Amino acid sequence: MAKYQSIAVIYGSDSSEWEVSCRSGEFTASRIDEFQYDVYEVFARFGKWNLVAMRKANSMRQAFPEGAQPVVDKSDFSVMVLGEKIKFDFAYIMQHGAPGETGLLQGYFEMLGIPHSTCSAFVTTVAFDKYACKSYLRGKDLVKMAPDAIIHRGEDIEEFCSATVAALGLPLFVKPTRAGSSFGITKVERAEDLPAAVRFAFTEGEQVIVEKAVKAQHELTCGVYRDGKDIKALPIIEIVSQTGWFDYDAKYNGLSQEICPAPVSEELTLRVQETSRRIYRYLGCKGLVRMDYLSADDGLYFLEVNIIPGMTNASRVPKMIRTSGQTITEFLTTIIENS
């Protein structure tokens, strides 16, 4: 018998990633076992939470038209549908960006005592901030880190850029510390272009990290999850981008190849998987997490931890799952039942 009955898949977000989040959420909801669970789709954006669709076990999906979507009661995470109060047993969080990847949504569910699919509020907060996560992992003999510098909104951009180029050299990657889907990221080849790239990154948040570009042979990614007491790594993917790096166009407009399993040596594959398991354990992760890396002549470099990776038919994690021999439905059941 299933551990939970009423599963709320919550998607949409307050960030630039909200449309990607909707696609991930709808895909996830459609793949949750229709014979075991009642699935409810909750669209949440800027404080407005509405039930947009539901599918009772062994029944067809029912969508609610705009203007007639039941409002979710955030005091206890429930909803009234046709005179019946439904209190959700479990939250499957598919919000990319804020608040689903910032720790705020996890904190809400933890205060209510509602189990959810992702890491704790603390781990999510640390992992989502690129600079904080690197600082947390640095010096732990887990993986290499590219040299970096950080600037906060309000600080002198020109002075920062001059000092950063002098310290790190070129080329550089400029990133918002708390954004995903490659929003706000620029590769900088010339020193005179750095201030504009920093200002662009500030459109996505209050802090910007500038990293020295790593001369990499491979860009690799690995999904990790918990199954009972075991931390398991999925087959790894190599990303080959037509744009030179994995920007938004490469991710979502078909300008990249994502090869699974990655055509790299068994030694490198095992190193990526073991490193991913070690980081997962060290951070205290839960649910499905994706780790991204660059492989260079002098070792494996950490890029980021993705607490809520994309879950559409074309996303990387579903490719890993299928390559592992599992169906998406089987995998989602494992995540739900082990949360």
Which residues does each PLM region occupy?
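Active-site nucleotide/adenylate-binding loops and adjacent lid/helix of ATP-dependent enzymes
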Residues: 1-11, 15, 23, 81, ...
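Residue-level detector of anion-binding/catalytic polar loops
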Residues: 38, 115, 143-144, 207, ...
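Phosphate-binding site of ATP-dependent enzymes
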Residues: 189-274, 295-301
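Peripheral (often C-terminal) accessory segments that flank ATP-dependent C-N-forming ligase machineries
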Residues: 258, 262, 282, 288, ...
